[in-house]
């Protein structure tokens, strides 16, 4: 059995983030074999992770890796925004997106599998649930990206143009979050729904007006709706006098696609009861 030195305990602590006593116990159990101790602690972390797996992870970060021709965008969730700002979480996210890009992954499942051991170590260290939620790989003639505070990520592909233009348009998408690329993509159902909403909201204004006037009013609202909902018709955030579609055309480019990720989109967050939370903390303190 190898001697359990202070240096060995320190190394294990630095590599796992566990407490000094836990590291010493793990090394003793592993006979001084640090790699076996890490494996044992991972197994212990897996138990902790299983307990945390039911906790909703709705915070986190978006990460992007690109080279101008291809990009990978991922979302990694944590339970708290505080953890999302910590170095250990950031390192896990960075390693995950690097892996996804290097392996040219197009589905999140292989990334989840590849990063599971590291995830378990992280969960065991930080004490809250962490999940790799989604991934998308995008390739194109020109690919530009924009990341806003690690909370919103956008990838834009162009035919023609250059990366800087694609990045500018990606920044616009991050700010405006369009639903569609072109007006033609807006469904007839969505237009009809918008029309009905307009008529209901303006019932008093249109009452008694000729049908042709009402039709013009509705047409104006639908035109505005299409401009607001489709990227190419939106006013460019850096120059509102120019539409995004015209900006691309002027540069000899065509917008092919955009991808928008926002942390927590579609995740139902639990509503915390502050009184219950305090009571639970007091009960735990008495144990």
From Swiss-Prot:
Q: Keywords for this entry? A: Cytoplasm, Elongation factor, Protein biosynthesis
Q: Where in the cell is it found?
A: Cytoplasm
The organism's superkingdom is given as Bacteria
> Disulphide bridges in this chain?
none
Q: What is its main location?
A: cytoplasm
The molecular function GO annotations come to: translation elongation factor activity
Mention any one GO cellular component term assigned to this protein in its UniProt record: cytoplasm
Instruction: Give the residues annotated as coiled coil.
Output: none
Listed InterPro entries: EF-Ts_dimer_sf (IPR036402), Transl_elong_EFTs/EF1B (IPR001816), Transl_elong_EFTs/EF1B_dimer (IPR014039), Transl_elong_Ts_CS (IPR018101), UBA-like_sf (IPR009060)
Q: Which SUPFAM superfamilies would you find in this protein's record?
A: Elongation factor Ts (EF-Ts), dimerisation domain (SSF54713), UBA-like (SSF46934)
- Chain segments carrying region Involved in Mg(2+) ion dislocation from EF-Tu: 80-83
Record's function text: Associates with the EF-Tu.GDP complex and induces the exchange of GDP to GTP. It remains bound to the aminoacyl-tRNA.EF-Tu.GTP complex up to the GTP hydrolysis stage on the ribosome.
Under the heading HAMAP family, the entry gives: EF_Ts
Similarity-based family: Belongs to the EF-Ts family.
Q: Which NCBIfam families match?
A: tsf
Q: What is this protein called?
A: Elongation factor Ts
Q: What is the lineage of its organism?
A: Bacteria, Pseudomonadati, Pseudomonadota, Gammaproteobacteria, Pseudomonadales
Q: Its gene?
A: tsf
